[in-house]
Every structure is written in C-alpha cells, then in structure tokens.
Amino acid sequence: MASLSGPISPTSLEMFKPGVEEFNPSKLLLLSNHQEGLLYPTILGSLELLSFKKERSLNLQRDKVCLLHQESQLLKLRGTGTDTTDVLLKQPMAISVNCCHDGTFTTWEQDRMPNTSTAPTLTESSGSLVTRLILIPRLTLSIGIQVAMRLFRLGFRLARYSLKVTILKAQEGLLLIPDLLRAHPIEPLVQDHVVEPILAIEPPPLV
C-alpha cells in the first residue's frame, strides 16, 4: 500500500481502481425445468440475460409462470369431481404476465374477463309468484289451527290464555293494515287487489 505522505503516482491510483468483472462463459449455468424438460440460461453475477437469448428466455419464463398457475388451479379442483377439461383451455386466455424490456418480471394478474352471473334467473310468471305468496300464509295458518285445536282439547288453561292473547293481537293487526298500507305502500305485484279491513270475529268461548 502506498504511503499517504507525498505525491501519489498514477500506478498507485490503479491499485484502488475497482475491477470490472469480465464475462466468463464458464459461469453460464443451465437450469432444467423438471416439468417440461426446458433449458434456459441463467448467468451468475449478471443482472440481465444475453441479448441473443433474452427473447427466448423471456418466453420460457412466461410459460413457466403460466404452468405454475394452471397447476395450482388444478390442484384445488382435484378430488372434487369437477371436470377440468375446459380449465386448460380457458386459463391461458385469462392469464397475463407483465414483463419489462430488460427481462425483469413483475407480478402477474388476472385479465378483466366478463363476469357471468351464476344467480338463478326468475323464470316464473307474476301469477305463479302471487299464488306462492298466498299459499304460504294458508299453510302457516293450517298448522296453527291444528295446534290450537289440540291445546283446546287438552284443556290447558295457560295455553288457552296465550292463544286468546295471540288471536286478539292478530285481530288488532288486521284492523291496522289499511293505515300501514297508506304509510308504507307496497310493490304493485301485491297491490293489484285492494286490501279491505277484516271485521273482528268473536273468539270461540273458552271451556
């Protein structure tokens, strides 16, 4: 090492000049892809690929990313009884890899594809829908009437009292229906028939 005192010669400056690493062909390493048997070069100590091999390596890297994505999707569908024949045809269309010109790969993302709605379409007419809306209360009322008749036959006073309170509350709700319809109008599908107030019916005498 040259002394720090005195003038510095040009030869001593060359000792501190950073050495430039020249390209050594022996550092060319071939990595094999075990899935497809592909060979693409990787240069140790270099940040970019060779110019004459850059485009070819870029395509191989693109295929490698796509193959890994397809394999992960097929592993998810394995054992579920799903037919994966169409998956291999549709996935390459939905995958894109963002690559820069210098060979650097960025994160890949799914392309924007038209989303097909899987919700069931409404195929029944409005008349059948109204019929279903009418049949649901009838079924509920028939079950309630059967339960009430059994309780009356058993003669439980507490059960008869609770049924009487329920009937009175139901009659009160029927009388309030017209006012509720004016305050909160409903859809035209159910508003075809004018709802009229139902007169209060005398409850059956308790035994």
Swiss-Prot record:
Entries under InterPro entries matching the protein: Corona_nucI (IPR004876), N2-like_embe-CoV (IPR044311)
Main location as per UniProt: virion
One term under GO cellular component: virion component
Compartments in which it is found: Virion
Alphabetically ordered keywords of this record: Virion
One of the Pfam families matching this protein, by short name: Corona_I
Biological function: Structural protein that is not essential for the viral replication either in tissue culture or in its natural host.
Homology family: Belongs to the coronavirus I protein family.
Further remark: The gene encoding this protein is included within the N gene (alternative ORF).
Name of the protein described by the UniProt record: Protein I
Organism from which the protein derives: Porcine hemagglutinating encephalomyelitis virus (strain IAF-404) (HEV)
